[in-house]
Amino acid sequence: MWPEVALSLLLFVLFVCGAITVGTYSYFTYVQTRLMVSIPWYYYFLIATGSLTMIFVIVAVVLYYIHLLLPLPIVLASFILFIFWLTGLVKASIELWGPMGSVNDNCVRYVYAAGFWGGRSLDTLARIQQEGMCNLWKTAFAMEMIASFVSVWICLMGWQVMSAARERYV
């Protein structure tokens, strides 16, 4: 028997993480395209991972409501999603927190260290955009970390459901 509240909450959090990641990296891809620079492989990888996560959540919810949600497929799918999320998390953390020239280094050096700015100008709009991009990177990193933890949690919850079902029939 699946714990309803925990499963619902974890699936909701996983869906939100997937949706935010898809939106974030789609926006990054759009910006890279407009800047006419190459698009890193992990942008597409994380868009695909977020999309697979949302599909997983929708399928799990449908199977739960028709009483066909089995623990073993959930454990396997959650583990695979964990590997995908962890791969994206490692690559994003290298880009965000890596050595000199990383995203965070550039944000601190060129965006946050500047003096006062404001007023009605194109420069103000550019600064708002720059801060938004810096914050979006940190948000994407946080969502990837949360999705990794939630995937493991769902995997362990499925394992507990499977163990409880075995004990009941032994």
Locations of the language-model features?
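Membrane-interface helix-loop junction between the first two transmembrane segments
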Residues: S26-M36
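Signature of small four-pass
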Residues: E4-T21, Y25, I39-P99, A147, ...
